[in-house]
Design a protein with these regions (language model features):
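Positively charged n-region of N-terminal signal peptides that target proteins for export
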Residues: 1-4
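Aromatic- and Gly/Pro-enriched helix-to-coil junctions and flexible linker segments
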Residues: 14-162
Length: 162
């Protein structure tokens, strides 16, 4: 009986959150990774994400309008550099457009394949190749221009009388 009690006590201590192995802290980003974020990733987030995950609205307590807030995450971690397969952000971005949790939402313009490739490379911890960065940026500029045009059209449209 005493052995069983000792075994049970040892098992409880081993399973306790106080003895559980803590996750490794994220490694600091390199200067090149910060530059990739600033030049390629942040503009993509501005075009596709910040309207719901920015200073005016924080869905899921997640903000993607600065590098620091992006790395901090929201209710869940956004991603860990070098671990793309465990990234909540990537899993949502790469979902089929028919899925319920796809990001950006179905009502918004989705990221292009080049933008997704650039985001994946960044989260993977790899440099974003120049050609991919240029293609992703061109797609981002087109998305921003389309959003600006749509906003101007909506503002100029006559308001319906009640």
């Amino acid at each position: 009986m005493r052995v069983l009690l000792l075994f049970s006590a040892a098992t409880l201590v081993a399973a306790s959150p106080f003895t559980a192995k803590k996750p490794e802290p994220a490694k600091p980003l390199t200067a090149a990774q910060k530059a990739d974020f600033t030049k390629v990733i942040q503009p993509m987030f501005d075009a596709h994400c910040v309207s719901c995950h920015g200073p005016k609205k924080e869905k899921g307590k997640l903000r993607l309008d600065t590098l620091e807030l992006t790395l901090k995450g929201g209710k869940n971690p956004t991603f860990v550099i070098g671990k793309p397969d465990s990234s909540m952000l990537l899993s949502r971005v790469f979902l089929e457009r028919t899925a319920g949790d796809v990001m950006p939402p179905k009502s918004e313009k989705p990221m292009t394949e080049k933008q997704k490739e650039a985001l994946y490379a960044f989260v993977e911890g790899q440099p974003i190749p120049d050609e991919l960065a240029k293609a992703a940026l061109a797609d981002t500029k087109a998305a921003l221009a389309a959003a600006k045009t749509a906003a101007a059209d909506a503002k100029a449209a006559p308001k319906a009388k009640k």
